[in-house]
Amino acid sequence: MKRRTFTAGLAALPFLGSSLTRAFAQDAAASLPKTYSGQKIRALASTGAAFEAMATVSRDFTEATGIAVEYVNLSYNEQYQKLILDLTSGAASFDVFNFAYQWKFEIEPYCADLANIPKEIQGAPDLALDDYPQRALEIYGRANNKLIGLPTLGDVTLFVWNKEAYKAAGLDPDAAPKTWDEVVERGAKLVSNGQFGYAMPAGKGIQTTVTWIMVFKSMGGEYFDASGAPTFASEAGVKTMKFLVEKLAAVSPPGNLAWDFPEMFNSLSTGQSGQSMMWPGAFGDLLNPKRSQVHDKIGWSPMPQASLLGGWSMGVNDASRSKDAAKLYVAWLTSPDIVRRMGLIGGAPARISALKDPELIKQAPNRPAVLAGLQGDVAEYPPIKEAEQVHIMIYDEVNAAVAKIKTPEQAASDLQGKVESFMRRRGYLKT
């Protein structure tokens, strides 16, 4: 666990980023009110460069407002457990928190509505909601017609391919596939002399679920019907299992039954596989010649047909004893100027203006593809509070099907049965 506190007395310390970017952030903070000077905000966040950037820029917020900001950074699972316990117990140990959108329906009853911050908090920046891809904003931040979060980290799956391998196989190295069938067609041409066509994870891990979700969406699948009943063994569900087992796995390396993200990344970065899915956060290593053998050979685009939305938002604890100060902070942290600055020091913007910014694109060339993915057809994780449990059911059944322990049809049927049983136990289904 990491804990970092910034107070007015610490604001003069040096920190990451150039003096130019700090001056930029200070200009953005100059008009903030000192109404809440002396109060303290505790923020719960995950770990990684993007969350470190949030803590770093907060020094300027403290300097401008006199509000101390303390960040507590935990791993994904630890953060989830800590957040749910804090909210449901009413302890209000944290005033603001980053959350994955998969959790939003579980935490919504405990979140403040952020829609009217500029009217409620004098001097708060405008939320500029039209500067976000609207479908992404809806998924990231809204639950039950309530704006409970403002995006703090934009993330969406991207398709990557080895241009040199494409060229050797007679494929256009500059053209991305438009459909999953085309991915497999190209993958078959890439299979040669120890090289494979796609780095498909089939282990009992989240990236297997990610792959299933994207293909399921491309097949026209929906998690639930109009009555709320699960439809994982629908025609689309069966087609998805068959596609993964009979087509995508067929052009992927052997031994992938234990794969998750590290193995997927390694297969692509060593040249073993010529195509893969990739999260934007991995591009720093993928384009680094010290960590990737294909650093100068990679092309990228949004996923064919639909990209899966990842990412995080920041919410305000409705029980916070410093709720107004917390709302001011969240509005400031997610304002366009501050988002841009965070992008320069490790942040992952979700705002359109930042993803189009020439300086930010120079730093991370994949940002236009991230924006295209966010603005395109996006898949999302199952929109129920127990989404994490459903993810486990999905990757268990995909793993069994790829291992030939079950037929694709049986795996789809068993997945449906597991989800139905789970939803009955949790009260979603009455019959």
From Swiss-Prot:
It holds the Pfam family SBP_bac_1. SUPFAM superfamilies: Periplasmic binding protein-like II (SSF53850). It is found in: Periplasm. One of its GO terms (cellular component) is periplasmic space. It comes from the Bacteria. The keyword Membrane does not apply. Keywords: Periplasm, Plasmid, Signal, Transport. Residues 1-25 form the signal peptide. Belongs to the bacterial solute-binding protein 1 family. Probably part of the binding-protein-dependent transport system y4oPQRS. This system probably transports a sugar-like molecule. This is Probable amino-acid ABC transporter periplasmic-binding protein y4oP.
